[in-house]
Amino acid sequence: MAAVERLTIATRASRLALWQAEHVRDLLRARYPACSVELLTLTTRGDQILDRTLSKVGGKGLFVKELETALLDGRADLAVHSLKDVPVDLHAPFELSCVLERADPRDAFVSNDYGSLADLPPGAAVGTSSLRRESQIRARYPHLVVKPLRGNLDTRLGKLDNGDYAAIVLAAAGLERLGLAARIRALLEPDDSLPAAGQGALGIEILQGRADVRAMLAPLGDAATLACVTAERAVSRMLGGSCQVPLAAYARIDGDELALRALVAAPDGRRIVRAERRGPRDQAQAIGESAARDLLADGADAILAELLPTSPAP
């Protein structure tokens, strides 16, 4: 296979997205010094629509379409995504070619005045961008007011600093990647806020026909992370996972096994269905599918029927 002399990485324009793309660029440059690796910065529809929640404007695919167009028309050879933003069903001619080692998958509590969610007084406003976080906060802290929070990381922090919210909840990985870990007042353990499928991981998307790019990316992948996110995304895929569904799935490697936890919640937090499964890590897909079936059998189907036009069958 002929050596690739030049690679172009498609990326969103936010500071966090650029950090992620630059991280992949630097890894590729270090491994393939003879290859020129550059960035193509694009603005996605998801970056432009900031006055409505993702659940109301089309969901996660809003962050990838423009990048996929660049792959199709040859302007880019690969696209770097936060994996939790990548739809679980990637259709031909696209493929998720590589998943890098995961950063911290937890959610982070950020506030200028309070140390944790438990410290917030009744009626305090908590900002979050996802129904998943909202439902879990409402379930544990029904006295708090959860308000939507859109925009890039700097915009969200600015809204907190302007007094729009008493606290906000964000992905810890994004704060840490941008050197903002000092803003974190508390990390929310999975018992308090189960993460989204793929949270903290970076995924690289290519065209299925680019065997040359796939071969170059292979050494960058992390097998343990891939197993975990495969199980998580299997749950989401079987349940029609999207921004319209308060769905969480988090897997970790425990010795030779993969341990998976998942939940589906009503947006108001009054109903939460949970499932746990574990098994050999090479059975990640099956573990995720089993957990999804458990959720459906235990009542998630009723929640999904209220949220989705066509809900999955058990």
From Swiss-Prot:
Entry cofactors: dipyrromethane
Pathway named in the protein's UniProt entry: Porphyrin-containing compound metabolism; protoporphyrin-IX biosynthesis; coproporphyrinogen-III from 5-aminolevulinate: step 2/4
Protein EC: 2.5.1.61
GO molecular function ontology, one term from the record: hydroxymethylbilane synthase activity
Catalytic reaction(s) noted: 4 porphobilinogen + H2O = hydroxymethylbilane + 4 NH4(+)
A GO cellular component entry from the record: cytoplasm
Record's keyword terms, sorted: Porphyrin biosynthesis, Transferase
Modified residues (S-(dipyrrolylmethanemethyl)cysteine): 243
Gene Ontology biological process terms in this record: protoporphyrinogen IX biosynthetic process
Cofactor detail note: Binds 1 dipyrromethane group covalently.
Assembly behavior: Monomer.
UniProt-listed NCBIfam families: hemC (TIGR00212)
Family, as annotated: Belongs to the HMBS family.
Role noted for this protein: Tetrapolymerization of the monopyrrole PBG into the hydroxymethylbilane pre-uroporphyrinogen in several discrete steps.
Protein's name according to its UniProt entry: Porphobilinogen deaminase
Organism: Bordetella pertussis (strain Tohama I / ATCC BAA-589 / NCTC 13251)
